């Protein structure tokens, strides 16, 4: 019969490898999302008007910078401070709760982006849907402000609730398979319930994201059938916009599902089985997903692609000037 072996501590090599991967993921995630933020924020500094999609991308990049920072702090806690043979310390629990709130804000922003794509790309025929699409386009800034405000309120409430309750420990010994002991801490139970509650609140934005993405998929299929009947031109701006939007949404869906599965698996690994290597693998997967979607967003956004091209050309010209300068100095010598 298969039994789960609890791994409270790991070797120095495993910890070093995990920390190296975490630093690499943090660097890549920070650079990609900071790039998206700086490109859009530079337009704000120059007092150029931002489009609705750029506003959403600006907020999305900020939330993901927080996500990467919290996941990196979680990695440091796992490698240096948190011993899984002991109850979870307060700082590690606070990091987990803040990550849950940031992840929920990230999902709401993705739902806003999906709604925005629907309002811009789908040609509605029903009067109510036309009015709704127009309302979404006009109220996107208020929606973003509401998401930021709700995230801040949730953060304050969760932190206050977490640090105000008495931190007493009651240990219950459970027997499994006649020889396996699990020390279930009340603090860990509270964290588990907070995790479930936060993910229940993630259901509405996730359903909103699925419905709007489904409508965009149906609109793309209808548009492709119309093109086959009325035109033979393979290059259509509306078709290309549909495909780029769907690439962004489908990639977010895939990365979000993978990250959510890793988060769900990490909870019993952390609280029940105390498997440190398993938790490290889950944290690594969760840290890789926001970076992957940021790369997809950069590749599908014309302004961000132009900024990448400009940076690459500047770097290439700088290297060429430096090489020419070295060649001239050697000639003079």
UniProtKB/Swiss-Prot annotation:
CDD domains per UniProt: 7tm_TAS2R38
Localisation per UniProt entry: Membrane
Residues carrying covalently attached carbohydrate according to the record: 178
GO biological process: detection of chemical stimulus involved in sensory perception of bitter taste
GO molecular function, one term: G protein-coupled receptor activity
Regions of this protein lying in the Extracellular compartment: 1-17, 77-94, 164-190, 273-276
TM region(s), chain numbering: 18-38, 56-76, 95-115, 143-163, 191-211, 252-272, 277-297
Role summary: Receptor that may play a role in the perception of bitterness and is gustducin-linked. May play a role in sensing the chemical composition of the gastrointestinal content. The activity of this receptor may stimulate alpha gustducin, mediate PLC-beta-2 activation and lead to the gating of TRPM5.
Name under which the protein is recorded: Taste receptor type 2 member 38
Additional detail: Most taste cells may be activated by a limited number of bitter compounds; individual taste cells can discriminate among bitter stimuli.
Keywords annotated in UniProt: G-protein coupled receptor, Glycoprotein, Membrane, Receptor, Sensory transduction, Taste, Transducer, Transmembrane, Transmembrane helix
Lineage: Eukaryota, Metazoa, Chordata, Craniata, Vertebrata
SUPFAM superfamilies in the cross-refs: Family A G protein-coupled receptor-like
Membrane topology per record: Multi-pass membrane protein
Family: Belongs to the G-protein coupled receptor T2R family.
Domain of life: Eukaryota
Main location: membrane
Cytoplasmic side: 39-55, 116-142, 212-251, 298-333
């Amino acid at each position: 019969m298969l039994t789960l072996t609890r791994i409270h501590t790991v070797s120095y090599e495993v910890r070093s490898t995990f920390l190296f991967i975490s630093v690499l993921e943090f660097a890549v995630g920070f650079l990609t999302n900071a790039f998206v933020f700086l490109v859009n924020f530079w337009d704000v500094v120059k007092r150029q008007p931002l489009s609705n999609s750029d506003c959403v991308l600006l907020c999305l990049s900020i939330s993901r910078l927080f996500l990467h920072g919290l996941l990196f702090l979680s990695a440091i806690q796992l490698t240096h401070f948190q011993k899984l043979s002991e109850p979870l310390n307060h700082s590690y629990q606070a990091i987990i709760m803040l990550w849950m709130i940031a992840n929920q804000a990230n999902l709401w922003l993705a739902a806003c982006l999906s709604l925005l794509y629907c309002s811009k790309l789908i040609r509605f025929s029903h009067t109510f849907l036309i009015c709704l699409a127009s309302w979404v386009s006009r109220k996107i800034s208020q929606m973003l402000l509401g998401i930021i405000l709700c995230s801040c309120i949730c953060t304050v409430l969760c932190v206050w609730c977490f640090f105000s309750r008495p931190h007493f420990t009651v240990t219950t010994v459970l027997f499994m398979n006649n020889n396996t002991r699990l020390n279930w801490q009340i603090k860990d139970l509270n964290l588990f319930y907070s995790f479930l509650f936060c993910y229940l609140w993630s259901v509405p934005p996730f359903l909103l994201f699925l419905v709007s993405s489904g409508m965009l998929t149906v609109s793309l299929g209808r548009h492709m059938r119309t093109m086959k009947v009325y035109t033979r031109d393979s290059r259509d701006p509306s078709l290309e916009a549909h495909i780029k939007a769907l690439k962004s949404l489908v990639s977010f869906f895939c990365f979000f599902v993978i990250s959510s599965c890793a988060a769900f698996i990490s909870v019993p690994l952390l609280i029940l089985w105390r498997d440190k290597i398993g938790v490290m693998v889950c944290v690594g997967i969760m840290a890789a997903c926001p970076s992957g979607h940021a790369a997809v967003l950069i590749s599908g956004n014309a302004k961000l692609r132009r900024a990448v091209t400009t940076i690459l050309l500047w770097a290439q010209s700088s290297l060429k000037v430096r090489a020419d300068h070295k060649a001239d100095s050697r000639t003079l010598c």
